[in-house]
Amino acid sequence: MTGTPGAATAGDGEAPERSPPFSPNYDLTGKVMLLGDSGVGKTCFLIQFKDGAFLSGTFIATVGIDSRNKVVTVDGARVKLQIWDTAGQERFRSVTHAYYRDAQALLLLYDITNQSSFDNIRAWLTEIHEYAQRDVVIMLLGNKADVSSERVIRSEDGETLAREYGVPFMETSAKTGMNVELAFLAIAKELKYRAGRQPDEPSFQIRDYVESQKKRSSCCSFV
């Protein structure tokens, strides 16, 4: 076969030009699961974080597993969060169990206007300890804080339960966006810290970080 005049061929002893290696637009990946009873607002919570929008209208329960990705920047590192939205119904629980082992962080939601969703948190935590990684990051979230007139779960009750299990806690609103981004950024900071702590880097405690940010938001009325 005759080569194109002037073009280098394999016989010329020159290596062909190669495209530069693909460089992803993130430094590390973190897999996050949203857990909790059906109707606590997991899908709306995810859409608020991903798109900055509130999914209003007729409620349609998640069937099985849905996922979305978003890259956030924390402390100069780009963290790609792979977020799995799970079905809360009992009949899909076996599907959810299959994803526990790969998750590095779990956001466990209840609805502050629904007593049973809060009562079932202990059962969810039992499942987590049975199926998830031993060092998985867990955060407890009391969602729908914007509907304060219908509240049946006090914030203090959420705080008490979180302390019992040694996990960070905050109340959130998928509708207004209150503390939604903070929850994911706290997770991203923790995963970034675990991925490669530098010798001169101060210790990072996710519970302390969440508490400091909650106080800061309260003082500045910025949520």
Curated annotation (Swiss-Prot):
It catalyses: GTP + H2O = GDP + phosphate + H(+). A motif (Switch 2) lies at residues 85-102. The modification N-acetylthreonine is found at T2. Its EC number is 3.6.5.2. Keywords: Acetylation, Cell projection, Cytoplasmic vesicle, GTP-binding, Hydrolase, Lipoprotein, Magnesium, Metal-binding, Methylation, Nucleotide-binding, Prenylation, Protein transport, Transport. Residues 221-223 form a propeptide. GO terms for biological process: positive regulation of autophagy; protein transport; regulation of eye photoreceptor cell development. A motif (Switch 1) lies at residues 52-67. Residues 1-22 are annotated as: Disordered. It comes from the Eukaryota. It is found in: Cytoplasmic vesicle; Cell projection, Cilium. GTP binds at residues 38-44, 62, 88, 143-144, 146, 173-175. It is an enzyme of class 3 (hydrolase). Expressed in the retina (at protein level). Specifically expressed in the bone marrow mast cells. Mg(2+) binds at T43, T62, D85. InterPro entries: P-loop_NTPase, Small_GTP-bd, Small_GTPase. A lipid is attached at C219, C220 (S-geranylgeranyl cysteine). Regulated by guanine nucleotide exchange factors (GEFs) including RPGR which promote the exchange of bound GDP for free GTP. Regulated by GTPase activating proteins (GAPs) which increase the GTP hydrolysis activity. Inhibited by GDP dissociation inhibitors (GDIs). The modification Cysteine methyl ester is found at C220. The small GTPases Rab are key regulators of intracellular membrane trafficking, from the formation of transport vesicles to their fusion with membranes. Rabs cycle between an inactive GDP-bound form and an active GTP-bound form that is able to recruit to membranes different sets of downstream effectors directly responsible for vesicle formation, movement, tethering and fusion. Acts as an organizer for autophagosome biogenesis in a GTP-dependent manner. Involved in retinal homeostasis by autophagy regulation. Belongs to the small GTPase superfamily. Rab family. Interacts with RIMS1. Interacts (in GDP-bound form) with RPGR, RPGR functions as guanine exchange factor (GEF). Switch 1, switch 2 and the interswitch regions are characteristic of Rab GTPases and mediate the interactions with Rab downstream effectors. The switch regions undergo conformational changes upon nucleotide binding which drive interaction with specific sets of effector proteins, with most effectors only binding to GTP-bound Rab. This is Ras-related protein Rab-37.
